[in-house]
Amino acid sequence: MVDQFRSFSRTVTERVGALSDRFMERNRPLAQSRMLWEIGLEGCEIRLLRSRLGLDSGHASRLLRSLEAEGLAVVEPSASDRRVRVARLTSRGRRERALLDERSDTHASTILEALDPARREQLVGAMRTVERLLTAAAVEIRMVDPAGRDAVLCLSAYYAELNRRSDKGFDPTAGISAEPHELRPPAGAFFVAYLRGEAIGCGGVKHHDGAPAEIKRMWVAESARGLGVGRRMLACLEGCARDNGAATAHIETNGTLVEAISLYLSAGYVEVPAFNDEPFADHWFEKQFADVEAHKLNTTRTLPRHKSPSRWA
């Protein structure tokens, strides 16, 4: 499996011209051209450029300086917050970006035209699948402060979607509480999913001694749906609940959120009678965890360095 992955990577880097110092016959390598493209016509914060391209600050700075030296880009403070640096294309940079787009389209067409129509469709379909799966693998889930910037952005988008999709209207202060202090350790935890540095989903869990854990505020941005983020987030929240001794998890949801209902059922939840008086909920779900103690042992045990896992058998 690893050998195939590496072979695929070598083929792609060779075919797209990533090894050349003159990408698309211009006087710069792919990395600089990609930075030029990523800045975009509207400009972009340096922080986001680094996250999207997976670059450390030193490498990103070198690429930007090379574009500045060519007169293709400028770096300046943001108009809204002078502490934030923004990269913008110059007029020359915009023309160069348009030329790179044109040559990239021609290069792609040349590769596709070498195949018959059936193989062309097969290749493009496989590319679509690879892109989706590699994007899914790039998603990171991190525990964050539920009152932090990214958490608040996700929760605001979540509340807006609930109000848009349901005729009940959602008021987070009217139902079962999930306040920041309830979603911080040791009372609970809150997680945000990130893709290329941008928050695309969230979820929280409330711990209760001797009672089921409550999974709250699960949401995934529309742009990230289909990547398996919801399932990963749910597994993360369940793992957190089990690590804190829960034998059962509870989730309630609104009837309009059919995707959430489908996810919960496929993840082993069963619908049960209402276990709380959440006014926005139409469905209540429960999941029993098996082998909670074994799970806690496995997650706290650390294998000695350089020793095979079989030594624990």
Where are the regions a protein language model picked out?
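N-terminal leader segment of winged-helix/HTH proteins
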Residues: 1-31, 150-155
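N-terminal helix-turn-helix DNA-binding core of bacterial DNA-binding proteins
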Residues: 18-59, 64, 70-72, 180-188, ...
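Canonical helix-turn-helix DNA-binding module
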Residues: 43-85, 94, 197-198, 202-204, ...
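Conserved GNAT acetyl-CoA-binding A-motif
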Residues: 47-48, 212, 234, 240-254
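Terminal interaction helix/tail motif
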Residues: 102-146, 285-287, 301
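Acetyl-CoA-dependent GNAT
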Residues: 136, 143-216, 221, 234, ...
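C-terminal "cap" of GNAT-fold acetyltransferases
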Residues: 144-147, 247-267, 273-313
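Conserved acetyl-CoA-binding loop-helix of GNAT-fold acetyltransferases
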Residues: 220, 226-239, 262-266
